[in-house]
């Protein structure tokens, strides 16, 4: 938990748990030179989200993520991708990194992995597992819990039978189109960012909290990401009719 707080650059969450572990450096997202400048002979891993969530819905560019992968290979550094929010089909791929032509050494996954059952996974590729961990190195009281693992199996069965990932890939362009139309129509919207069913609208000229409250009053649940982004992470089974209803309610909040 302390290490997780260390790599999450929010004073609000870090202050109650200081002193932290330390040894963490931060680079600018989608700026490869910024990442390279932080690398030393003591760098062991680069940790990042494939699509930033709390930071404001920023997808990594292909050039950036591929460049980070190349740096990790060049300097023998682990690439750890956080797919807790952007994974499990949300971007139209089972895992967001699959759209980038790279593969992480380590991946974290949770949230939708259990569809309500609390479970997380720390996934290593074969090379990393063979050279870093042996049984007993990382003990856990609840690791491999039968109930949680049964839930994960059921989730994957559901994904396969209902073609969840394919549905997201087919339906997301419609959502993106409708959101782009809102950006064109309303001056208070500066841009749309995101991938698949993980979308954000940049709100300008008015508090994003005001838009959120008005949306809730109209029966639409949305949340912020960063200080000025309206975040939308709808259910993966949402239909075009649902999207139309969502856009209608969102327009009422923007007017």
Kindly give the residue locations of the regions a language model identified.
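Conserved N-terminal phosphate-binding loop of PLP-dependent enzymes in the Aspartate aminotransferase
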Residues: 2-255
């Amino acid at each position: 938990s302390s290490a997780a707080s260390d790599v999450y650059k929010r004073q609000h969450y870090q202050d109650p748990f200081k002193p932290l572990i330390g040894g963490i450096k931060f680079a600018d997202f989608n700026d490869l030179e910024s990442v390279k400048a932080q690398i030393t002979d003591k760098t062991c891993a680069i940790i990042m989200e494939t699509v930033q969530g709390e930071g404001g819905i920023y997808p990594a560019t292909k050039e950036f993520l591929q460049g980070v992968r190349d740096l990790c290979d060049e300097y023998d550094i682990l690439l750890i991708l956080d797919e807790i929010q952007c994974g499990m089909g949300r971007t139209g791929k089972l895992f967001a990194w699959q759209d980038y032509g790279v593969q992480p050494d380590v991946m974290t996954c949770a949230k939708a992995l259990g569809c309500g059952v609390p479970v997380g996974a720390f996934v290593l590729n074969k090379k990393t597992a063979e050279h870093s961990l042996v049984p007993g190195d990382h003990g856990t009281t609840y690791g491999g819990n039968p109930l949680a693992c049964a839930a994960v199996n059921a989730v994957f069965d559901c994904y396969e039978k209902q073609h969840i990932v394919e549905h997201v890939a087919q339906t997301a362009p419609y959502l993106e189109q409708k959101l782009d139309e809102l950006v064109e129509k309303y001056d208070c919207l500066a841009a749309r960012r995101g991938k698949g069913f993980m979308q954000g609208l940049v709100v300008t000229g008015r508090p994003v909290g005001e838009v959120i409250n008005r949306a809730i009053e109209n029966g639409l649940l949305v949340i912020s990401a960063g200080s000025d982004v309206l975040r939308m992470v709808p259910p993966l089974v949402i239909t075009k009719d649902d999207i139309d209803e969502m856009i209608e309610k969102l327009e009422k909040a923007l007017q």
